[in-house]
Amino acid sequence: MTTANQPICPSPAKWPSPAKLNLFLYITGQRADGYHQLQTLFQFLDYGDQLTIEPRDDNQIRLLTPIAGVENEQNLIVRAAKMLQKHPGNTPVPRGADISIDKCLPMGGGLGGGSSNAATVLVALNLLWQCGLTDEQLADLGLTLGADVPVFVRGHAAFAEGIGEKLQPAEPVEKWYLVIHPGVNIPTPIIFSDPELKRNTPIRPLAALLSTPYANDCEPIARKRFREVEQALSWLLEYAPSRLTGTGACVFAEFDTESSARQVLSIAPEWLHGFVARGVNVSPLHRVRSGKKLKAVSADNDLQRYVRSK
């Protein structure tokens, strides 16, 4: 069992909230409650949102940077903080926080932004409030917020089954990726409710999955229903192996070197917005928690400008 780390507060209280990619994603069934069962391989990126979290000596949870179109009380950031605040294992002392977010990841992009935000709040406030919960306990809390939250809490690349909550640590090759947002957001229910979605891919052992070309069962639906996704993938596939992440809308191409990825980004059409990042098997959030410094990532890129303009 993972034990809770000693409090280490990044200065000045800034916490990474990294993106993830689904390197492959197969839908193997659907439960009676409507949730889809899957097999997927998660890997983090050294790129994402950034949260600034300042503890308060009262019970107020304040999100200082509201996200357009999302009520604060429904935001996973606030919900995660309040859930931890009310955890029965916590001592009854005033705990609050002021939280702001530098939003770089698009909503409805398949990069896990909301789930990552929730996980960062749980991990950071567990330390700042000195709750002493283990990663397993935090992951269990996170699962009630979303199926992808536990992998961000645990902080290691993983092979996932079930609805995404059954995690097995994995070590995929840490390649470079060009991630493209095609200018459309895709709510997950649109893909999962499509009657043509393939829901019966045979369950296979991890070794078999790793030895065959990767694919995403959601990709045909996204390409069919969203012209922008079809166009983005068609363009990317001219340069490198490419596919959808999650339920979209972002697509990605893999490269062996950063320079190769940046060269393709430099010739992308104006209607595509993207960034280059390294795939990493240890989450930047957990590297910060353990006191390690992160490699500086460009504070400004095309996708950040696009997201901030919305």
Swiss-Prot record:
NCBIfam families: ispE
GO MF: 4-(cytidine 5'-diphospho)-2-C-methyl-D-erythritol kinase activity; ATP binding
Short name of any one Pfam family annotated for the protein: GHMP_kinases_C
Protein name (record): 4-diphosphocytidyl-2-C-methyl-D-erythritol kinase
Listed GO biological process terms: isopentenyl diphosphate biosynthetic process, methylerythritol 4-phosphate pathway; terpenoid biosynthetic process
UniProt entry keywords in alphabetical sequence: ATP-binding, Isoprene biosynthesis, Kinase, Nucleotide-binding, Transferase
SUPFAM superfamilies reported in the protein's UniProt record: GHMP Kinase, C-terminal domain, Ribosomal protein S5 domain 2-like
E.C. no: 2.7.1.148
Subunit and partners: Homodimer.
Catalytic activity: 4-CDP-2-C-methyl-D-erythritol + ATP = 4-CDP-2-C-methyl-D-erythritol 2-phosphate + ADP + H(+)
Catalytic residues of the enzyme: K20, D148
Binding residue positions for ATP: P106, M107, G108, G109, G110, L111, G112, G113, G114, S115, S116
Metabolic or biological pathway: Isoprenoid biosynthesis; isopentenyl diphosphate biosynthesis via DXP pathway; isopentenyl diphosphate from 1-deoxy-D-xylulose 5-phosphate: step 3/6
Purpose of the protein: Catalyzes the phosphorylation of the position 2 hydroxy group of 4-diphosphocytidyl-2C-methyl-D-erythritol.
Family recorded in the similarity comment: Belongs to the GHMP kinase family. IspE subfamily.
